[in-house]
Amino acid sequence: MNTQSQTIVVKLGTSVLTGGTLKLDRAHMVELVRQCVHLKKLGHQVIVVTSGAIAAGREHLNYPELPKTMANKQLLAAVGQSCLIQAWQSLFAIYGVNVGQMLLTRADLDDRERYLNARDMLQALLKNGIVPIVNENDAVATNEIKVGDNDNLSALVGILASADKLLLLTDQSGLFTADPRKDPKAELIKEVHTIDETLRKIAGGSGTALGTGGMATKLQAADIARRAGIEVVIAAGSAENVITDVVDSKPQGTKFLPVECALESRKRWILAGPASNGTIVIDDGAVNAVQQKGSSLLSKGISSISGHFVRGGVAKIVNTKGELIARGISRYSSDDLHKILGKHSQDIYAVLGYEYGPVAIHRDDLVLI
């Protein structure tokens, strides 16, 4: 067993916690808890990102079918979250371990100060030997109950905690060359060095009815985490000793190797935190300058703007084919950029009557994707 202290984020999908049924599988949950506690005893820090609130609420209320309306889904989440945290609390208590609940929303990560507060709270729990149990605040977060929820959340939590490993446990044994449920010739991809369009095409859509994340969202989460220097493993939550095996570097599922030059703290926040409310399309010359030369983005290289964002807001940067190039904090609002796009830096003041510097997005505020 690897005894060097590590911080491990374990994301447990609804399919893992329910075993494909309509209620929580507490017998399996206690086995997962046993593995987490074993890691703690070896000096590792463990964070659990849990799905299952809607499933727990449906079980508790004996709800006949999965509701279609947002309000009723959030009703089940509100009831189920208390059941879910009670289940985790009672199971960890068997081993004398305390847990602390953290319910996050996108707003907690969009704002830099709130992001840092969340990071400090997470670190405080870990330093006091408490296992953080993290979930999206489903009852109020309208953007959560759709594809991408806790997979992406677990990557963001990994960044908050400066984690070493992120385990995305699901009902599949990892990422395959095709959907193994449909193609008997599908082969497990054991190790991934680069996430490209080929892999994205292999990844499918949403998974189970009770859950909201499919392999595509896990791939997206893996890409975010590995860019922050975190090793990611997608594996079957039902596999024997899957958590302890991954930490001990034994083969389980699909391993995504982290990027060697991990991002510094502020750029991690740009990558993980704020939602992008607008898109900046840049020409080929600007793409080359940003990607190959590490330059700042100038207004001259901007072809068009879509969406709305304020000065200091985060925008997606794409090439003329619509391919995502980067994310960055804009020094000018979208309204201002509409006026100065294609203009030389020295012309900004003449056009606007003011300026916030010669660049649209400084390279220190730019994260390549």
From Swiss-Prot:
Positions that bind ATP: 11, 170-171, 212-218
Coiled coil: none
GO cellular component terms, semicolon-separated: cytosol
EC numbers for this chain: 2.7.2.11
Alphabetical GO biological process terms: L-proline biosynthetic process
Pfam family, one: PUA
Gene3D superfamilies: Acetylglutamate kinase-like (3.40.1160.10), PUA domain (2.30.130.10)
Entries under InterPro entries matching the protein: AceGlu_kinase-like_sf, Asp/Glu/Uridylate_kinase, G5K_ProB, Glu/AcGlu_kinase, Glu_5kinase, Glu_5kinase/COase_Synthase, Glutamate_5-kinase_CS, PUA
Keywords from the named record: Amino-acid biosynthesis, ATP-binding, Cytoplasm, Kinase, Nucleotide-binding, Proline biosynthesis, Transferase
Membrane-traversing stretches: none
Catalytic activity field: L-glutamate + ATP = L-glutamyl 5-phosphate + ADP
Major localization listed first in the record, in broad terms: cytoplasm
GO molecular function: ATP binding; glutamate 5-kinase activity; RNA binding
Residue ranges annotated for the PUA domain, each copy included: 277-355
Subcellular location as annotated: Cytoplasm
UniProt pathway: Amino-acid biosynthesis; L-proline biosynthesis; L-glutamate 5-semialdehyde from L-glutamate: step 1/2
Binding residues for substrate: 51, 138, 150
Family note: Belongs to the glutamate 5-kinase family.
Function: Catalyzes the transfer of a phosphate group to glutamate to form L-glutamate 5-phosphate.
Name of the featured protein: Glutamate 5-kinase
Source organism: Aliivibrio salmonicida (strain LFI1238)
